[in-house]
Amino acid sequence: MPRYHPISVLPEIDCVQSDLRELRWTDDAVVADFIIPGDEHHALRVLFTNQVIIRILDEMPLNTESESTPKEGLVPHHFAYRVEEATFETTQSQTWKFTQHPATHYRFVTGWTCLDVLSAKEPTFQVVKRRPISTFD
């Protein structure tokens, strides 16, 4: 049974009104910027500085994902969680999880785009100025 453990993040974000604004993956970090509802000038940055496995999906398939039992610990409109025994975590490479032990599953929920991250390090959170999203020629 998936167990959700809410993570306290400041500023508190109403996940229903937020969305993933930008995701960048470099050789040494994964950076995810989320919309802070009501603040057009800043974003909430979630940063992982180690090897990770990620999954990005819409909120609808996440809610309809086949789990054996109800989800324990979900808080209405909450944004960030540490999750145990969810399908995303249990179906990943055992070798990767062994070499990255202890790997923890983090889930960031918005009203549109959700982000799952499997990581051996905790994420850091910071409020940053919004910048124009890069485009490619």
What residue spans do the PLM features occupy?
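Surface-exposed, interaction-prone regions used to assemble/regulate multi-protein complexes
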Residues: 1-137
